[in-house]
Amino acid sequence: MKFYNFNKESGKQITKFNSDFIMTRIIQTNKNASIGCIHLGENGLIGFHKAVGPQLLLILNGEGLVSINQEEYYKVQPGDAVFWEKNEWHETKSENGLTAIVIESEELNPSAFMPSKT
């Protein structure tokens, strides 16, 4: 399990085409990717399971906890990205709810675009 940031501070100012915004690149892949939105409600749980392939979880709203061993949990909040390798066991839970985007693909390299979270 690795942690990354995709918050505003890790982005780049874009001014092309008279634009004025900050964009944080997240991932690029040449292989098929599955992208979904997860809505965990109050006391929501994504049960302990093995990642079927590389998986990137992007926290958009709310807070939660992630674990790879069901003993030590790490807090996640908006702007955090969590990466699990294929076959890595993990669990995600939230006391008050969270919304996240999940990206699954055989070809994920989040460190190519996002800084590691320290």
Name what the model sees in each region.
Residues 1-33, 116-118:
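A short, N-terminal "cap"/entry segment at the start of jelly-roll beta-barrel domains
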Residues 52-64, 69:
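Glycine- and acidic-residue-biased ligand/ion/polar-headgroup-sensing regions
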Residues 60-61, 77, 96:
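A cytosolic small-molecule/anion-sensing beta-strand core signal
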Residues 46-48, 66-67, 84, 89-95:
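Short beta-strand His + acidic residue motifs that chelate non-heme Fe in jelly-roll/DSBH
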Residues 86-110:
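Ligand-binding loop in jelly-roll beta-barrel domains
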